[in-house]
Amino acid sequence: VYKVTGSKKFVLDGHVANKLIVVTRTSGNAGDRDGITLVLVDSDAAGVEVTRTIMADSRNASNIEFSGAEGQLLGEEGKGANVLDYTLDAGRILIAAEMLGSVEECFERTVEYLKTREQFGVPIGSFQALKHRAAQMFCEIELSKSVVLEALSALDDDSDQLAEMASLTKAR
């Protein structure tokens, strides 16, 4: 049994989680890979206080305070960094895929608006400046799609370039 003390900020969907995987430092210094330990804590355990935070982007997050909350070891003590690296890379890629879907929906709605909204008796999509903007948006989306699909393939293949691809999806 491990006792966890400290806080975690902006935990996505933390207010609806039954179990919390808490990244803790059990030895070493800040910045060291060794000494990071993963602990599983019940969200309703004594010493756990969850406060929901409404985010501007409509994501649900929470701030979680741990005051001697008891939890169970996940994996090996002090060896959680390798598991954490893979998990965070996968999360970055999957969030990028989610955001790509959202931006594609926005683009489809934009194109529909360009086709239906009229100004001076013609659809505004016939205006050259708006055509250029739509073309630029399309190119950016296609580039992002290419990066996300490549990153998803790297995730499926457990590629050595997974971390690099995850970083690239964040940049796009």
Language-model-detected regions and their locations in the chain:
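Alpha-helical interface subdomain recognition
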Residues: 1-3, 77, 86-172
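Structured core elements
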Residues: 3, 20-23, 40, 63-65, ...
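A short core secondary-structure module
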Residues: 5-49
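Residue-level signal for inorganic ion chemistry
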Residues: 6, 39, 64, 103, ...
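Flexible, small-/acidic-enriched active-site or ligand-binding loops
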Residues: 10, 42-76
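Short alpha-helix boundary/capping segments
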Residues: 12, 31-33, 54-58, 85-98
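Residue-level preference for beta-strand/loop junctions
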Residues: 16-18, 58, 128, 165
